[in-house]
Every structure is written in structure tokens, then in C-alpha cells.
A protein has these predicted regions:
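Bacterial Sec-dependent N-terminal signal peptides
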Residues: 1-20, 440
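Short glycine/proline-enriched turn or capping motifs at secondary-structure junctions
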Residues: 3, 419-427, 517-521
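Extracellular, repeat-based ectodomains that mediate carbohydrate processing or recognition
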Residues: 19-437
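Short, solvent-exposed secondary-structure boundary motifs
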Residues: 27, 439-446
Length: 529
């Protein structure tokens, strides 16, 4: 006899992701703002980095751990040294270069709001991130006025082109310094040992009055460098725009394109001051003409995860495409903190911070969700859950702005920080892509009702999330075999979240219907493995 256990979870609940979340930092202190780099030549090999509170000097340092088996096991934690014992570190960024050499850049400075001294440091590892070379100064706080050492991004040319092995580093002026602020770039042709003088990326289309002039970077498989920054320069446009800078000659000259012209509908609500709306640009290793940008804007009436894509090497862009598939305009449901990446075969994934199940505003708890695209960012899969616990809100206004996303051809890798332990710690998850692409879409017959199942397919347990403002009295979940026989009928009570555990049921596909009285509200399929 089949046995179902139906539990209503009201205030505090957890979900089962496809694989268990792994706490990489395991710290009783604050650990946040992480980055994940996956080796494109061996996607089972990845390196994680994050800001780690060090008890040796009571400052933040850079911490790294490495996995060579797809995240099943990790090396011991490594801490990068400071220039001086009084310094603190922030803003990790990594990139795999030629011969699987991995580069790590970060800020090391006298204080997070200090104008005293600081540098963007670069180190590299020739053994996959197990150990690191002595970090070198790439950009000095004195290289240009107003501290041009904020929010670095690093990228390395791993192609077989004429600039193979060149490493690029971008930065911006510190947000708290006087305007103007610019995106800056430098490069190294000797594996990061020495660096060229920094120069402005925005010499053709100025960043204007933008405070955060960050230049996000990627390099295509043919060695073309792309950088994306926001410009609000009213002499050229009355609207803010996202500028894409392209260089095919090693960063010597740049060609600008406009990817996004932002309108008033894109502006983030003033009340949502904790929303992290940074962006990411990624190039498709299987198609050098395909790039995808992911960001957060208010375009569809609330902060959503949106992507824009190019299929002609950055010349023109399509979008926005809404990635999160919860109900549109659902009362200030805020999704943010996104990152995207490609697998070697061209599959694209986005990971983000999601609040569809936890309430309104940017101060409510959150979960981590993801979605994949098999067509270069034109369309996306159903969203799937990454985190297996709900985290209390992170209330840091400045900083803690990014998480990590990487892929192999068979798995999505996610790295993020949350507060489930009471202190912000850094977590990792690997989710099999086969579990995602075989999931069956849900048909909604009543537009005021949305039903999600995670995971699906599943083995012995799945989670039902019912999003609706309708009362759920006299509602049941009717389950049918594929030959049309009703095999069970489960009562559904009030509340968003329900968990079903199946002790005995044959593998196969089953049809379910959410029924209220004589009306079918939603229907779909379960795949039991």
C-alpha cells in the first residue's frame, strides 16, 4: 500500500536540493562575497574564494579552497597573505588562463573606506589553486586620483590567438570618493608578474555621473576581450546605458556598442536599498558570437533577474528575458544577486537570490535559485532550487555584492553566502543538469494559482509550493497512473509549502491534478526514479 506523509510547513521550512549544500567556510565569524572559477578544460576542477575573517589580525583576508572532483571533496582552506598586518582584503575575482593556470585578484588595503593606502593584488596558481604564488601589486591607490582600486575583475586569454596568455584587470574608483569615477583597465603579458599603466575604458563613451563605474569582463574562445560598464553621460544620451567595449588586439584599442538603454521602468525602488543589482557578462565557449548579460532591474514591475543576449559578437543585443518564473508583479517580490556562466558545450546557467517563498521587500529571508538556457539566453528552463535551507536576510548595504556560478556539461555549480548558521558562511552546491532538463512543465488552468515541485524527477520525496491568494478549502491533489487510473487523492490545506514523502511507488511517470471542487486549478506530471 502506498503511504504518503503530507506536512504543512508554516514559518520555518527547508527544501531538498538535488545534492546537499556544503559549507566551505565553516566559520563562527562573518564570511561572505564569494567567487567561483571552473576550469573550462576540466570542469570537474574548480576554485572557490571568499572574504574570510582572520583571527590573526582581526581583519578580512582572502580564503580559497579547490576541488578536482566536481565539488565532492575540497582542499584545505588557504589564506592569502596581507601586504601589512594592519591591512584587510575584499572583492575576490578569478579566471582560468592558459594551461589551466588560475589567477586571483583582490583588494588589500588599510580599511574598507580608507584613502590612506591600498592595492589590487594579483596572484596565480600553477597547481590548480592548491597553493599560490606571492601576490604582486597590479594597481596602486595612487595610480590615478580617487582610489582606482575598487571592485576588480580579472580575465585571461586562454585561446591560441596572438595575445594568448595575456591577463586583463579592470577596476573602478572607490564609490565613496569624489566624482568623476571611471572604469580602468591594465594588462599583463608575463603571467601577472608586471602590469601596464592603467588607462580609461570609457574614453569613447564616458561613464559620466555613475557612482559604480565597474567594468565586468569576459574573453571569448577566440581571444576577444569584452567589458561592460554603465554610462550616464547626458551629452550622449538622456538615459543610462550599458556600454560593451570590445577589443580584438589585446586591449590596445576598443570598439564600443550599446547593449541596453535603461528606461524609467528599469529603475530600482528607492525603498529596496539592500538590493544587489550588479551584472555579469559571459561568453559562450562553443560559439564565439554568443554573449549573455545577466542583471537585476525593475523592468517588469519588480526586481527581477533579466538577461540580454547577443548572437553577433556584441554588435546588437536582444532582451530583456525574464529568468525567474514566479508570478509577475507579485507584490514587490525581490530577486537579486545574480551571476551567470557557460558550460564548455554552450549551456548557460544563472544563479540568484530569490524571495518568492519568503515575502516582500529586501529584508525578508531568501533562498538560492537557478535556471539554465540551451539556446544562448533566448529561453530558460523552469527555475530550480539550489539552497536546502532558508537564510535570514543579509543586511550589508555596501559590499557582499556577488555570488558564484559555474558549469560543466553535466552540472550547475553554485557558490553563495547565507546566514543559516547565525553567521554568514559560504556554501557550495552541484546540481545535475539531467535532473533539470527532464523535468515536466506545469500547466496552470487558473492564472491566480502557481504550483512548483522541487525536485522533479524525484526518488522518494518532493516539495510542493502553491502560490495563490485564493482560499484552499476543499482542495486535493489527485494522482493518476499513465493509463488513467486514480492511484491516490491527497488533501491540501492552507499554506505555501508542503512536503510529500513516498515510501512505496513504482518508478515511472504519474499525472497529478490540483482540484478544488469540480475545478482543476493546475496539472502536470511527476517523474519518480
Amino acid at each position: 500500500m502506498k503511504k504518503y506523509i503530507l506536512a504543512l510547513l508554516i514559518c520555518c521550512f527547508s527544501l531538498s536540493a538535488f545534492t546537499q549544500n556544503v559549507n566551505l567556510s565553516n566559520s563562527p565569524y562573518w564570511d561572505g562575497e564569494c567567487y567561483l572559477a571552473v576550469n573550462p578544460k576540466n570542469p570537474m576542477h574548480m576554485v572557490s574564494a571568499w572574504m574570510y575573517f582572520s583571527t590573526s589580525n582581526l581583519k578580512n583576508s582572502m580564503a580559497t579552497r579547490t576541488s578536482f572532483d566536481g565539488g565532492k571533496t575540497w582542499s584545505a582552506l588557504q589564506q592569502l597573505p596581507h601586504l601589512y598586518s594592519t591591512f584587510t582584503s575584499a572583492d575576490p575575482t578569478m579566471y582560468f588562463g592558459k594551461d589551466s593556470c588560475v589567477y586571483l585578484a583582490y583588494i588589500d588595503l588599510s580599511g574598507l573606506k580608507s584613502s590612506d593606502s591600498g592595492y589590487i593584488m594579483v596572484t596565480r596558481s600553477v597547481n590548480g589553486g592548491v597553493t599560490w604564488k606571492t601576490p604582486v601589486k597590479a594597481i596602486s591607490y595612487k595610480a590615478q586620483p580617487n582610489l582606482p582600486i575598487d571592485r576588480p575583475w580579472i580575465a585571461a586569454d586562454a585561446s591560441n590567438g596572438p595575445y594568448s596568455g595575456r591577463v586583463y584587470l579592470t577596476s573602478q574608483n572607490a564609490y565613496f570618493t569624489p566624482q568623476p569615477h571611471y572604469p580602468w583597465i591594465t594588462y599583463s603579458s608575463d603571467s601577472g608578474a608586471t602590469w601596464s599603466p592603467i588607462k580609461r575604458l570609457d574614453d569613447s563613451i564616458p561613464s559620466g555621473t555613475i557612482t559604480d563605474a565597474t567594468a565586468f569582463t569576459t574573453i571569448s574562445a577566440n581571444g576577444t576581450l569584452y567589458a561592460a560598464y554603465v554610462s550616464y553621460y547626458t551629452k550622449y544620451s538622456l538615459y543610462p546605458r550599458l556600454v560593451i567595449i570590445k577589443s580584438s588586439n589585446g586591449g590596445n584599442t576598443f570598439t564600443p556598442y550599446i547593449a541596453i538603454t535603461y528606461g524609467s521602468s528599469d529603475a530600482m525602488p528607492v525603498a529596496d536599498s539592500l538590493t544587489k543589482a550588479g551584472l555579469c557578462i559571459a561568453s559562450n565557449p562553443a560559439d564565439t558570437t554568443n554573449l549573455v548579460i545577466v542583471t537585476t532591474t525593475n523592468h517588469f514591475g519588480e526586481p527581477d533577474i533579466l538577461t540580454y543576449n547577443s548572437h553577433n559578437a556584441g554588435k546588437t543585443w536582444s532582451g530583456p528575458v525574464r529568468v525567474n518564473d514566479d508570478q509577475m508583479g507579485a507584490n514587490d517580490t525581490i530577486h537579486d544577486l545574480s551571476w551567470g556562466s557557460f558550460a564548455p558545450n554552450g549551456t548557460y546557467a544563472v544563479t540568484w537570490r530569490d524571495r518568492r517563498n519568503t515575502g516582500k521587500s529586501d529584508t525578508v529571508p531568501f533562498q538560492i535559485y537557478a535556471a539554465i538556457s540551451k539556446d544562448g539566453g533566448n529561453t530558460y528552463s523552469s527555475n530550480f532550487l539550489i539552497s536546502d535551507a532558508i537564510s535570514p536576510a543579509v543586511t550589508i548595504v555596501h559590499g557582499d555584492d556577488f555570488l558564484g556560478c559555474g558549469l560543466s556539461d553535466s552540472a550547475v555549480y553554485s557558490l553563495w553566502s547565507d546566514m543559516r548558521t547565525g553567521k554568514e558562511n559560504t556554501f557550495f552546491n552541484a546540481t545535475s543538469i539531467s535532473k533539470i532538463i527532464t523535468a515536466v512543465p506545469i500547466i496552470t488552468d487558473n492564472q491566480s494559482v502557481k504550483v512548483d515541485f522541487y525536485p522533479n524527477p524525484f526518488h522518494d520525496q518532493t516539495n510542493i509550493m502553491i502560490h495563490t491568494s485564493l482560499p484552499m478549502q476543499n482542495t486535493t491533489m489527485q494522482v493518476y497512473s499513465m493509463d488513467g487510473k486514480k492511484v491516490d487523492e491527497l488533501p491540501i490545506g492552507e499554506g505555501v509549502m508542503h512536503t510529500i514523502t513516498i515510501n512505496s511507488l513504482a518508478r515511472g511517470t504519474y499525472i497529478w491534478s490540483l482540484v478544488q471542487g469540480e475545478k482543476t486549478l493546475a496539472r502536470g506530471k511527476w517523474v519518480i526514479e
